[in-house]
């Protein structure tokens, strides 16, 4: 069984036991979180939401919080001596999907 959930402005396909990286959420490590925005549930029977599936939830356990690799944003204009360098590290949360309730 799998499901498509929406979290952090993104849609993610998840299965039970899968480890996924999502946008940072406000939860402590080891805490259980519930995702209510389930858009699709697949398996032997298929449930499609309009826009979400009624009564369907996905529970997950927070493993850790972290920051991704640094990306460099560099602005440059030729012949004008204009250079701007800025770095950014996006925070994330690693969760393990425990159960899909459909």
Swiss-Prot record:
GO terms for cellular component: cytoplasm; ribonucleoprotein complex; ribosome. It comes from the Bacteria. Keywords: Ribonucleoprotein, Ribosomal protein, RNA-binding, rRNA-binding. GO terms for molecular function: rRNA binding; structural constituent of ribosome. One of its GO terms (biological process) is translation. PROSITE patterns: RIBOSOMAL_L21 (PS01169). InterPro entries: bL21-like (IPR028909), bL21-like_sf (IPR036164), Ribosomal_bL21 (IPR001787), Ribosomal_bL21_CS (IPR018258). Disulfide bonds: none annotated. It holds the Pfam family Ribosomal_L21p. The keyword rRNA-binding applies. The keyword Lipoprotein does not apply. HAMAP family: Ribosomal_bL21 (MF_01363). This protein binds to 23S rRNA in the presence of protein L20. PANTHER family: 50S RIBOSOMAL PROTEIN L21, LARGE RIBOSOMAL SUBUNIT PROTEIN BL21M. Part of the 50S ribosomal subunit. Contacts protein L20. Belongs to the bacterial ribosomal protein bL21 family. This is Large ribosomal subunit protein bL21.
């Amino acid at each position: 069984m799998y499901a498509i959930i929406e979290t952090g402005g993104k849609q993610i396909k998840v299965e039970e036991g899968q480890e996924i990286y999502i946008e940072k959420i406000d939860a402590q490590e080891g805490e259980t979180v519930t995702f209510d925005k389930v858009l699709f549930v697949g398996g032997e029977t298929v449930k499609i939401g309009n826009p979400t599936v009624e009564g369907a939830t996905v529970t997950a356990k927070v493993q850790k919080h972290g920051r991704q690799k640094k990306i460099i944003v560099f602005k440059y204009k030729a012949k004008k001596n204009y250079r701007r360098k800025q770095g950014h590290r996006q925070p994330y949360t690693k969760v393990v999907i425990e159960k899909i309730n459909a």
